[in-house]
Amino acid sequence: IYFNGGGLMAGSGSEPRYAGESMARKGIIAITANYREGIFGFFSHPQLSKETAYKGSGNYGFMDQVAAIQWVKTHIADFGGDPERITIAGESAGSMSVSALMASPLCQGLIAQAIGSSGSVMGFNAVATLKEAETAGVEIAKALGCKTIKQLRAMPAEELMKRANVRNVPKYCIDGYFFTEQPTQTYADGKQLHIPLLIGGNN
């Protein structure tokens, strides 16, 4: 399963460079999975956190990736694949996602191996706390003239995307669900997925 790059704010699995024909010719089942990006994928707000059972918000793009892996785990045998041999891979933000998924408790038992190229969740600043991400989300909402999540949801998606104008890697956070602690701590304590990992860089 290949996750696209693009700074968690742009890109998709349908880009020609991610086509899997060469792998398919070798008998590999190649899958790309889209995930929410920018304000749709990584936006925290106290009102959103209040809606969830785990009282957190913000890592929707990562949770989309988990859902894609779960779907493949359930259905890949119907396509001739082995649910016990799922490999996740990505470049840039996709590679960062790979290392994030390996640190998430949601991925236990889902993945057999991983490939990351030119990116790691540990290659940036510390992951934002939920409070920090919520505060940033409130400021974004204010800049859009919205005091409530209801107002944001009423805005057409295209308008919201343009007006939010996300131009930097958006704030993912320790939401208590996808991330329960800093990924650096998870890896330091050896609590990440213990699976074969191939890492490197590309151009």
Language-model features: where?
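Short, well-ordered surface patches within globular domains
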Residues: 2, 14-18, 22, 149, ...
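Cap/lid segment of the alpha/beta-hydrolase catalytic domain
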Residues: 3-66, 71-78, 121
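Mature extracellular/periplasmic domains of secretome proteins
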Residues: 19-24, 102-103, 187
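Loop/turn elements at helix/coil->beta-strand transitions in domains of secreted/extracellular proteins
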Residues: 26-31, 82-86, 107-113, 193-196
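Short beta-strand immediately N-terminal to the catalytic nucleophile in serine-hydrolase-like folds
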Residues: 88-91, 115-117
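Short glycine-enriched nucleophile-adjacent loop
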Residues: 95-107
